């Protein structure tokens, strides 16, 4: 690997743990690359080896145990990406085939989003060194606003467009910098002085809705996505600030204002309920001078009971965790139905007779009429059912299983990470 294409830790837009696979066309199967082993595979932004000043994206894989580089593949616009199953994806570039066996479906989905985002940026041409960020919808809570200055002299009436200045941050994990345009349209030029110190940036704090976590993978953001074990043994980040972060990126500005005065009309309550004595004038009640205590909000209560699932890596609430909520969790009822109905016979037949060159085939009981082998597949299943009559029980059992999932009697449950 040359020095120009060597990725650093900050250049990765997504990084997961997986086993790098290679395709053997002679046997028609996938085998572990260089003897197998868990590798750190990610999509990173690097400079093109041609040295034309343009940058691209590289899929880089490094085995953990010996730091051996087992995968290097540049992302191209004509890359063909195939999701064979939830934990195995493969792609093809220039008649070269690469594959990855992920540790969880969530890792596979994250890597797929990272590759698709890299291809989109290559198509849009936003990876050149002179490209600018023009989509304001991608700006988040860590945006840094810089004031544009007029570059014209005092005697010149010519105004130049504000230039975009992007500086690499040193302390925070990721930070996007952009310039507020058209600042010169409403103010005269003598209001801007180059010798004025720039105001200290403050972090804008927002509280997103906890019902759904939104994960955005942007190659311009230096987001580090860790592997499967890291999510199980590390606390969930993003909801509470990390005290280990640099002080410069952890300031919060609160607007100071006069505290509003509230007029409370309290009901008449017997003083005995509060342990107060009788009023000296003989009245049975007294004025309550204490403010009513604030109860814990429902959101804070739910936050304390939410955990991350080890199977699908989604956040769930312990009180609402019932059967059928996690599709990736193991389910003994579903496994028993497939074994009793001998569905392994149908899988074997479709794999050997109706699979594509990559070994992928359609679900045996799929009703998608757009499949070119729809009629042939069902005719083969009907013929196979004469040899294995127990296959006829699969559809009724599957219908009962779906009813059980709707009634929350069957299906997998979320399991909290340790």
From Swiss-Prot:
> Where found in the cell?
Cell membrane; Cytoplasmic vesicle, Secretory vesicle membrane; Cytoplasm
Instruction: Name the Gene Ontology molecular function terms of this record.
Output: protein kinase binding
Q: Which domain of life is it from?
A: Eukaryota
Keywords from UniProt, A to Z, are: Cell membrane, Cytoplasm, Cytoplasmic vesicle, Membrane, Phosphoprotein, Ubl conjugation
Q: Domain SPR, which positions?
A: 308-416
| PTM summary | Phosphorylated on serine and threonine residues. Phosphorylated on tyrosine. Phosphorylation of Tyr-228 and Tyr-231 are required for ubiquitination. Ubiquitinated; leading to degradation by the proteasome.
User: Boundaries of each WH1 domain copy?
Assistant: 5-122
Membrane topology type: Peripheral membrane protein
An annotated GO cellular component: plasma membrane
Q: Quote the biased-composition stretches of kind Polar residues, using this chain's numbering.
A: 146-156
| Keyword tRNA-binding part of the UniProt annotation | no
Give the InterPro entries listed for this entry: KBD, PH-like_dom_sf, SPRE_EVH1, Sprouty, WH1/EVH1_dom
Q: Where is the KBD domain?
A: 201-257
Which stretches of sequence are listed as region Disordered? Answer: 127-172, 275-302
Phosphotyrosine occurs at 228, 231
Q: Which residues carry this modification: Phosphoserine?
A: 206
* Protein task: Negatively regulates Ras signaling pathways and downstream activation of MAP kinases. Recruits and translocates NF1 to the cell membrane, thereby enabling NF1-dependent hydrolysis of active GTP-bound Ras to inactive GDP-bound Ras. Inhibits fibroblast growth factor (FGF)-induced retinal lens fiber differentiation, probably by inhibiting FGF-mediated phosphorylation of ERK1/2. Inhibits TGFB-induced epithelial-to-mesenchymal transition in lens epithelial cells.
State the oligomer form and interacting partners.
Homodimer and heterodimer. Able to interact with SPRED1 to form heterodimers. Interacts with RAS. May interact with ZDHHC13 (via ANK repeats) and ZDHHC17 (via ANK repeats). Interacts with TESK1. Interacts with NF1.
Q: What is this protein called?
A: Sprouty-related, EVH1 domain-containing protein 2
Q: Which species does the entry assign this protein to?
A: Pongo abelii
């Amino acid at each position: 690997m040359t020095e120009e294409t060597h990725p650093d830790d900050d250049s990765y837009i997504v990084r997961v743990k997986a086993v790098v696979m290679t395709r053997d066309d002679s046997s028609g199967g996938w085998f572990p690359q260089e003897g197998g082993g868990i590798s750190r595979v990610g999509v990173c932004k690097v400079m093109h080896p041609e040295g034309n000043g343009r940058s691209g994206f590289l899929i880089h894989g490094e085995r953990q145990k010996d730091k051996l580089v087992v995968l290097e593949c540049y992302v191209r616009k004509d890359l063909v990406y195939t999701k064979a199953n939830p934990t195995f994806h493969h792609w093809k570039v220039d008649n070269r085939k690469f594959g990855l066996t992920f540790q969880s479906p969530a890792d596979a989905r994250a890597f797929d989003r990272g590759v698709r985002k890299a291809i989109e940026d290559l198509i849009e041409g936003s990876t050149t060194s002179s490209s600018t960020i023009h989509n304001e919808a991608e700006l988040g809570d860590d945006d840094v606003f810089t004031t544009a200055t007029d570059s014209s002299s005092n005697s010149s009436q010519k105004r130049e467009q504000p230039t975009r200045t992007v500086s690499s941050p040193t302390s925070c994990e990721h930070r996007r910098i952009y310039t507020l345009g058209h600042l010169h349209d409403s103010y005269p030029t003598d209001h801007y002085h180059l010798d004025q110190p720039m105001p200290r940036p403050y972090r804008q704090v927002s509280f997103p809705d906890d019902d759904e976590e939104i994960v955005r993978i942007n190659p311009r953001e230096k987001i580090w996505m860790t592997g499967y074990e890291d999510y199980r043994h590390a606390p969930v980040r993003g909801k509470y600030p990390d005290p280990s972060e640099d002080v410069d990126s952890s300031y919060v500005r609160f607007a100071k204002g006069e505290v509003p005065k509230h007029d409370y009309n309290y009901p008449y309550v017997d003083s005995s309920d509060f342990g107060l004595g009788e009023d000296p004038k003989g009245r049975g009640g007294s004025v309550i001078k204490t403010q009513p205590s604030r109860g814990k909000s429902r959101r804070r209560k739910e936050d304390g009971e939410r955990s991350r699932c080890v199977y699908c890596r989604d956040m769930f609430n312990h009180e609402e965790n019932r059967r059928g909520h996690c599709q990736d969790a193991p389910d003994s009822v579903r496994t028993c139905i497939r074994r009793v109905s001998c569905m392994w016979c149908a899988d074997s037949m479709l794999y050997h007779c109706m699979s594509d060159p990559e070994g992928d085939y359609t679900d045996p009981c799929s009703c998608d009429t757009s499949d070119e082998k729809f009629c042939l597949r069902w005719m083969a299943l009907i013929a196979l059912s004469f040899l294995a009559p127990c296959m006829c029980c699969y559809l009724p059992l599957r219908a009962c299983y779906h009813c059980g999932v709707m009634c929350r009697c069957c299906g997998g449950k979320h399991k909290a990470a340790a």
